[in-house]
Structure formats: C-alpha cells, structure tokens
C-alpha cells in the first residue's frame, strides 16, 4: 500500500517515508504537527541468526524519535494477533537492553485518533 504523504517538517530521514498503513501516516502527522523530530523505520535490529551468521529474525520499529532516544512501533492488528509482535519486542529488549521502545496497540491508536480527530481505516 502506498499512501500519499504530506511535506513533513519534522521528518529527519534520508528518503521519503513509505508508510505500511494509514495509522502510521496519521501518527506521523501528529508528530509533525507538534514539531517532534522523527525518522521512519531507520534501523533494523537483528533478533536471531543461524549458525552461519545469516539473519533468521529481525525487527524494524516504525518510528524513531531522536530527541527522546525512543523507538515507537504502531500495530493495528487485532489484539489476539499481537502475540508474535510482543514476542519480538521481548527478544529485542533482551538482546538490546539499552534500546528504548514503546508499542502502541490498536486501542491506543483508536484513542489517539478520537482525541486528535484523525482519519483511520477501521
């Protein structure tokens, strides 16, 4: 899915962001509106490698907020399908304890959308 993106002022990435879903786009708009510097999917964290050193599992958080040194992952999956993502986050925290990351669930995004009158796909 390719979503048309506005001309972001607080975006700090090298390439224009290509959001995976409308929730990510709307979160980016909120960050930008408040002037919070952000990057989109700037880093991939290796979670597991095979015996030859090939990456078996990795995780790429949606946003990085450099001034807060915080990664943000947005998930709009049904709560019952979030188990795999939570497992990846646990692995990331075990392997990279210095990395700060926050997961926003579908209900968090819905509350954000209601509060800021965002247009999110159901």
Segments the model singles out, each with a brief description of its role:
Residues 1-122:
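Electrostatic, structured charged patches in enzyme active sites and in nucleic-acid/phosphate-binding
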